[in-house]
UniProtKB/Swiss-Prot annotation:
Name of the coding gene: ycgN
Matching Pfam families: CxxCxxCC
Disulfide pattern: none
Cross-referenced PANTHER family: UPF0260 PROTEIN YCGN
InterPro entries, per the entry: Puta_zinc/iron-chelating_dom, UCP006173
Protein name per the record: UPF0260 protein YcgN
Lineage: Bacteria, Pseudomonadati, Pseudomonadota, Gammaproteobacteria, Enterobacterales
Homology family: Belongs to the UPF0260 family.
Length: 153
């Protein structure tokens, strides 16, 4: 009986991030697209500024990469989140499953692993589909900074 109950525990509650298979690791991504928005770094302070400018490979409507398997060929600056480098990504959104699980928290109620689809995530406006703009439409990147410093407000 106890063995049966163990099997009913979702993998993200029964395994550490390091213990997860590659498929389990990948499935943690909710597909919000927040990682695929360009970030700017202040050269003097190293502060990161978030923009609403989508990577050229991001399909804004679906919040999915157009060329996920070959994304590094198309976008050399694309960053691969791994178990090893996760602690260095302090800029991950507070809603990110990787961040939440690393902090000992559970998945949010709208997460696709719990709901079976991305509809609840989009409904909660977690995804970037309602704020993202195409890189090709941007004239001045500074106009698209979401977390402007006080001096730039």
């Amino acid at each position: 009986m106890a063995e049966h109950l163990m099997n009913d525990v979702p993998f993200w509650q029964s395994k550490t991030l390091d213990e997860m298979s590659d498929a389990e690791w990948e499935s943690l991504c909710d597909g919000c697209g927040q990682c695929c928005l360009h970030k700017l770094m202040d050269e003097d302070t190293d502060e990161i500024y978030f923009t609403n400018v989508a990577c050229r490979q991001l399909n804004i409507k679906t919040c999915q990469c157009r060329n996920y398997e070959r994304r590094f060929e198309f976008e050399p600056d694309c960053i691969k989140l791994t178990r090893e480098n996760l602690p260095t990504f302090e800029w991950l959104p507070m809603t990110c499953a990787y961040r939440l699980l690393a902090e000992g928290k559970d998945l949010p109620v709208w997460h696709p692993l719990l709901t079976g689809s991305k509809a609840a995530m989009h409904g909660e406006r977690i995804s970037v589909r309602h704020i993202a703009v195409k890189e090709s439409e941007v004239i001045d990147w500074q106009d698209h900074i979401l977390n402007k410093p006080d001096w730039a407000q």
